[in-house]
């Protein structure tokens, strides 16, 4: 029996994990084992919202060392993380400034400024990327305007997964799928767009040309002295999650559900027409030259903040209490900028309901019900937008990632969208990370080949839409999910 042992480092906005995958070639069997799980979160430092990258690096190394201590031969390592954020380095490879997080307010007003100065349509035609106030282009503009004293010291700008790969190998890389999230990559050339870079204030010399997933960046030397290849996987966690989504046919959509919810479909060509621009659709890079045509939805970030503020530890009990409440009494727009990082999420949700003359969610369960119903309705709205964009309805929706364990939200999504939902795999980003490693090791042919492995080994659950549910009646009552957006705008 031939085995491959691959390690995936998967960092999310709220937690990180080091996972060991064991692939058996003859039976095409893939098993995962968690080696080390650790917390991640936002920190306040010198007036900025930041990431503790030193703590994350220590946790990554701890996890890798644990594998080596077990005497396991590691064939390769891959790292995926969230997008848009970066670390600046000087000529000696030392950090310049702070690793500021995308939820920091330093970019306020800069997106509108860019649209006014460069033209919204021109930016979109160049990048194909949706307008989000924290995109890297606006973060760099904020840095170069607000901290010009740092500029002479900057030699390199590395996105978060590339930074950790650099820390392991000493080699720099700019991986394509994550680079596209910056809104700085030209959609036609797959290279940095000089006009957009110039507006950001960044120097093109800070960046190397983006490379597609599947190349070996360098090697990590383990404590035992072995050199282990570090592979450039699809380093944006959503790109990895999509690779592991067992999409079957052209009418399948995906929803990567976690702190963020990313809903979309795969395409061989980008969508940058006026309809896509009006809907704020993004065309992020995927594996094998595919585009991830999708839209960002605020996701379970709202719930995470409520759990934190109300000090709720028993999530299953909360979901059970939530399920007992009537649907659609409290509806908000989860994508409103007011929910990006408010001082108090509970108060912000209540204020949004008050301002739209709705009942006010007071209890823990009412707040959760508000979030779940609002997300499900927004999912339906976005799915409708995506279907209109491509001119064809979807037949099924694959929900992957940690959020797919929320059976209540899965069923609400199926009911609101009127579509069959297939939930799983939970560790989609990790699996997609492993998939690219196995392709790089010549164990698998391509993404479709890997998806067959996922389909046969992952635990998948199907949710059938119930047209008689409260949320389905709510959607039918307003006749079109497009109106939902207006109701909660």
Swiss-Prot record:
CDD domains: ASKHA_NBD_FGGY_RhaB-like. ATP binds at residues 13-17, 259, 304, 402. PANTHER family: L-RHAMNULOKINASE, SUGAR KINASE. This is Rhamnulokinase. It comes from the Bacteria. Belongs to the rhamnulokinase family. It is an enzyme of class 2 (transferase). The active site is at residue 237. Gene3D superfamilies: 3.30.420.40. Its EC number is 2.7.1.5. It comes from Escherichia coli (strain UTI89 / UPEC). GO terms for cellular component: cytosol. Monomer. InterPro entries: ATPase_NBD, FGGY_C, FGGY_N, Rhamnulokinase. Its cofactor is Mg(2+). Keywords: ATP-binding, Disulfide bond, Kinase, Magnesium, Nucleotide-binding, Rhamnose metabolism, Transferase.
């Amino acid at each position: 029996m031939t085995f491959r042992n691959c390690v995936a480092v998967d960092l999310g906005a709220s937690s990180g994990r080091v996972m060991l995958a064991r692939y058996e070639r003859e039976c095409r069997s893939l098993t995962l084992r968690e080696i080390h799980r650790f917390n991640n979160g936002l920190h306040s430092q010198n007036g900025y919202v930041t990431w503790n990258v030193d703590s994350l690096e220590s946790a990554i190394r701890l996890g890798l060392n644990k594998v080596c201590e077990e005497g396991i031969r590691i064939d390769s390592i891959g790292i995926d993380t969230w997008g848009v954020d970066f670390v600046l380095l000087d000529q000696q490879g030392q950090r310049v400034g702070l690793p500021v997080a995308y939820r920091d307010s330093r970019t306020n007003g800069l997106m509108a400024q860019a649209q006014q100065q460069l033209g919204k349509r021109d930016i979109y035609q160049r990048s194909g990327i949706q307008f989000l106030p924290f995109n890297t282009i606006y973060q760099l503009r904020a840095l170069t305007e607000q901290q010009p004293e740092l500029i002479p010291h900057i030699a390199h700008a590395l996105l978060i997964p590339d930074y950790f790969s650099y820390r392991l190998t000493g080699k720099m890389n700019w991986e394509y799928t994550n680079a596209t999230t910056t809104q700085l990559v030209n959609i036609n050339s797959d290279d940095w767009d000089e006009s957009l870079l110039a507006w950001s204030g960044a120097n093109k010399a800070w960046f190397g040309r983006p490379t597609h997933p599947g190349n070996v960046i360098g090697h990590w030397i383990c404590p035992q002295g072995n050199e282990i290849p570090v592979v450039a996987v699809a380093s944006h966690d959503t790109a990895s999650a999509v690779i592991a989504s067992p999409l079957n046919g052209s009418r399948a959509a995906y929803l990567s559900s976690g702190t963020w919810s990313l809903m979309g479909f795969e395409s061989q060509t980008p969508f940058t027409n006026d309809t896509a621009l009006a809907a704020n659709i993004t065309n992020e890079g995927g594996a094998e030259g595919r585009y991830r045509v999708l839209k960002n939805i605020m996701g379970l970030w709202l719930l995470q903040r409520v759990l934190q503020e109300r000090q709720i530890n028993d999530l299953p009990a909360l979901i059970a209490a939530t399920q007992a409440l009537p649907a659609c009494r409290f509806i908000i727009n989860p994508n409103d900028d007011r929910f990006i990082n408010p001082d108090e999420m509970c108060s912000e949700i209540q204020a949004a309901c008050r301002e739209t003359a709705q009942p006010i969610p007071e209890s823990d369960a009412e707040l959760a019900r508000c979030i779940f119903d609002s997300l499900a309705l927004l999912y339906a709205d976005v799915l409708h937008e995506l279907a209109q964009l491509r001119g064809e309805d979807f037949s099924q929706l694959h929900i992957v990632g940690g959020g797919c364990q929320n059976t209540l939200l899965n069923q609400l999504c199926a009911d609101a969208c009127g579509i069959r939902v297939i939930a799983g795999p939970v560790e989609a980003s990790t699996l997609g990370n492993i998939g690219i490693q196995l392709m790089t090791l010549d164990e698998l042919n391509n993404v479709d080949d890997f998806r067959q492995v996922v389909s046969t080994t992952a635990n998948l659950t199907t949710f059938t839409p119930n047209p008689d549910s409260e949320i389905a009646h709510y959607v039918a009552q307003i006749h079109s999910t497009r109106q939902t957006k207006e109701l909660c705008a």
